[in-house]
Amino acid sequence: MNASYTNPRRLLLRAAAAGGWCSITGLAPLAWAHHGWSSFDQERPLYLQGRASEVKWRNPHAELVLERSGLALPADLAHRAVPPQVAPVDGRSLLARATLPQRTDARWMVELAPITRMEQWQVPEIRNGAELAVLGFTFAGEKGEPILRAEYLFLGDKVYGLRSRPA
């Protein structure tokens, strides 16, 4: 094996160079904007509904600002059918445990899925003004910015699972 690939100092220098390149090319904000699933409290699913604004249909994932229109769980939420996906997600349990956020922010940044996954689910491109709902996760204790990572997207009469591709 080439020593330059295992030398910790060289690896650090390569990472620093890559970070500098990202800053120069303007890609650093995209890297910092992306949150992995482990960043979120996946034990407390939240339900939000409202109108989409500031929609960004691009990678690393589609995102939008959801302007909340109401603060109520739909009576049928726990009984809604959810589509199967490749990842082992217990959708029925998530819907049954869904709650409303405790914080009162009127606008939430919603992280959807990468565009390729949105295409696999055949999600139509969401436009500003579209009515939608999401079930997902925010940071532990609802600390930090009002950001929700969507597990399920409710758009019209369709439900899309966003953790992985359709099963």
Where do the model's predicted regions map?
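Short boundary/loop segments of OB/S1/cold-shock single-stranded nucleic-acid-binding domains
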Residues: 31-43
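OB-fold/S1-family single-stranded nucleic acid-binding modules
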Residues: 140-163
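Short aromatic-glycine-enriched beta-strand elements
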Residues: 58-69
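Mixed-charge, low-complexity intrinsically disordered segments
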Residues: 70-100
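Structural detector for short beta-strands of small beta-barrel domains
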Residues: 45-58
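N-terminal secretory signal peptides
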Residues: 1-10, 14-26
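Beta-strand/loop nucleic-acid-binding surfaces
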Residues: 106-120
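Short nucleic-acid-contacting surface segments enriched for D/E, G, S/T with interspersed K/R
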Residues: 119-133
